[in-house]
Amino acid sequence: FYRMLRERLTGDAVISVQCTSPLVAPQSYWCIVKTLEAVGFRVRPYHAAVPSFGEWGFVLASPRPLPETLSLSSELRGPSRFLTDKILNSLFDLPLDLARVEAEVNRLNNQVLVHYYDQEWGSLK
């Protein structure tokens, strides 16, 4: 899926992928990041505290390098009670307990992501 998506993106396209909780399921989270990297995406992992889910992970991905510092465009600067340039950039500052861990690339022939999900989320029973 990600390979086909990458082939169809044009120009400076950027996608955001909702991954999972990098705190509860670090291998699952980093497996998704690594899978995006494996098909040629440049990635910027990030996280946010979501009230109904807790610490949640996402990743920005693009065929082109992503800037180290992001700025809200004027089109996105409508009324916001939360998001500022400073807060936006802090989302990409992963604390040590969310640091990258070893994980395999998810493929159709290994479905390792399913194993990671079962192992990590199943341990919460």
Regions of interest found by a model, annotated:
Residues 1-11:
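A short glycine-rich, Lys/Arg-flanked "PGG" loop and its adjoining helix->strand segment in the class I
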Residues 12-19:
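Conserved beta-strand signature within the Rossmann-like core of class I S-adenosyl-L-methionine
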Residues 19-28:
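Acceptor-substrate binding/catalytic loop of class I
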Residues 2-3, 27-47:
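Conserved Class I S-adenosyl-L-methionine
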